[in-house]
Amino acid sequence: MSKKTKQELENNKLSKRLRHAVGDTINDFNMIEPGDKIMVCLSGGKDSYALLDILRRLQASAPIDFELVAVNLDQKQPGFPEEVLPTYLESIGVPYKIVEEDTYSTVKRVLDEGKTTCSLCSRLRRGILYRTAKELGCTKIALGHHRDDILATMFLNMFYGGKLKAMPPKLVSDNGEHIVIRPLAYVKEKDLIKYAELKQFPIIPCNLCGSQPNLQRQVIGDMLRDWDKRFPGRIESMFSALQNVVPSHLADTELFDFAGLERGQNLKHGGDLAFDSEKMPERFSDGSEEDESEIKIEPQKAERKVINILANKPKTCGP
């Protein structure tokens, strides 16, 4: 096999792996429904480019119809190349809206020199995006956070907030008016890096965030990447833990009735067994065969009509 053919095979495996991971996420959390108009938040980074690209490919073959509209918030950061995103979106034929709001000056004016800007910047950005989704009549807001972002958020909340809380794949917005989805929730960041290189997305660096190398999130990210190198499978096990929560073995009295616990009570996950040594699911293993398998970790959910986003559109017969 030639080097070129081998690379093409690897690229094809990567594309299939990402498509299946995103499709599984959408299916597991019922993220997209018939007739949805989805606002894809496009920052110019690798994650949001990949999100839009994969959703477009699913849209072309899915058994249901839904719309996509890309939205970019131009925060008026110095040196931001305003022409890059419109040129790219017009070249691929995706409807889009560029929202111009000078949040950069607001953040710089309000925060002291040297303070991290992410928290305030994020709050300002959310409000503008919620307003834009309403103006466009969108039913869902799609964000580009991936598996590693979700785990990093969990550790940030544990280390600095005293909460066992991560970043949900699907939620209701702060103002209660929108459904926010994260279709990349099952996707590894390292796969997104490879995909961005493969697709040659016109990446736009964030000068505001990128100029703050000592951010807590960056430190946590470095920790996770180090673990991934030194302890293969640890990241996969941690994400699996987010889908296998056992309230009776934690310490939150709001989640489990410890006060009403009685002898002989039949607990769903057992009583005194604190460590389970069962083999972890291999959805996120590094082997390509496992990545494309049918192994699933099903979240508990109410009965509903299941639509497989990975199924093909029904064929129509001619007259």
Curated annotation (Swiss-Prot):
Q: Mark out the compositionally biased spans (Basic and acidic residues).
A: 276-286
Q: Which compartments does it reside in?
A: Cytoplasm
Q: What is its EC number?
A: 2.8.1.-
Q: Which cofactor does it need?
A: Mg(2+); [4Fe-4S] cluster
* Domain of life of the source: Bacteria
Q: What class of enzyme is it?
A: transferase
List the catalytic activities from the record. Answer: cytidine(32) in tRNA + S-sulfanyl-L-cysteinyl-[cysteine desulfurase] + AH2 + ATP = 2-thiocytidine(32) in tRNA + L-cysteinyl-[cysteine desulfurase] + A + AMP + diphosphate + H(+)
> What are the transmembrane regions?
none
Q: Which GO BP terms sit in this record?
A: tRNA thio-modification
Cite the Pfam families for this sequence: ATP_bind_3
Q: Where is this region: Disordered?
A: 272-297
Keywords from the named record: 4Fe-4S, ATP-binding, Cytoplasm, Iron, Iron-sulfur, Magnesium, Metal-binding, Nucleotide-binding, RNA-binding, Transferase, tRNA processing, tRNA-binding
Identify the InterPro entries for this entry: Rossmann-like_a/b/a_fold, TilS/TtcA_N, tRNA_Cyd_32_2_STrfase, tRNA_thiolation_TtcA_Ctu1
The record's GO molecular-function terms, alphabetically, read:
4 iron, 4 sulfur cluster binding; ATP binding; magnesium ion binding; sulfurtransferase activity; tRNA binding
Residues annotated as binding [4Fe-4S] cluster: C118, C121, C209
* Positions occupied by motif PP-loop motif: 43-48
In the UniProt record, does the keyword Hydrolase occur? no
What else does UniProt say about it?
Answer: The thiolation reaction likely consists of two steps: a first activation step by ATP to form an adenylated intermediate of the target base of tRNA, and a second nucleophilic substitution step of the sulfur (S) atom supplied by the hydrosulfide attached to the Fe-S cluster.
Which family does the record claim for this protein? Belongs to the TtcA family.
The free-text function statement in the UniProt record for this protein reads: Catalyzes the ATP-dependent 2-thiolation of cytidine in position 32 of tRNA, to form 2-thiocytidine (s(2)C32). The sulfur atoms are provided by the cysteine/cysteine desulfurase (IscS) system.
- Subunit comment for this entry? Homodimer.
According to UniProt, the name of this protein is tRNA-cytidine(32) 2-sulfurtransferase
Its gene name is: ttcA
